[in-house]
Amino acid sequence: MTESVYVHIDTTSNAVLTKGLTATDFANSIVHFPQNLLLLDPSASAGEYESHTGLKVIRGTENIQRFFSSSRNRRGFDELKWIDFTDLTMLKELTPLEISELLYFGHMKTHLHSPFFYKLQNNFVYFDLNDQLNRIYYRYLDEFYRIFASKLSSILSDKINVKKSFFKKETPVEKISVELLKEMRNLMQE
């Protein structure tokens, strides 16, 4: 378990740069769970090939949950770079310019225009960066605050109960308020 969490929020693009929050933390705490993923790494081994974009997709929440849980074991081999989308037929409606924007986004890990595509109706864009950093674009920043509150509560619980004896009951830790973290937003910005 990580002992520290680094957070930087860019409210202009709803990008959150973090260290200490994992893909598992993300998957366990989000409310708007992705229906489908478009993997932005052209050499990704997971997923099925989608001919219109030339990228791989993972369809269905069960497959996505398996992908998230297997991503822990693959750490260091494949970079996690993906964007969620709602409808495969709308994915096939992307123009060549929109596909090139997605390719640029995946390669440079930054957006040219908005990180949220109308046709994809995406809520997230997820990038693993080096040194256990990740950048996630959230359509709804409340999703991030829920993940962050859950992670901080988990770290606190581990710290408080680290020297618990076999016979002693674990000390419960109240979940940190999302509203409190929202009030602290200015501390997480430049």
Q: Model features per residue range: what roles?
A:
Residues 1-190:
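Structured alpha/beta or helical-core interaction and ligand-binding surfaces enriched in interleaved
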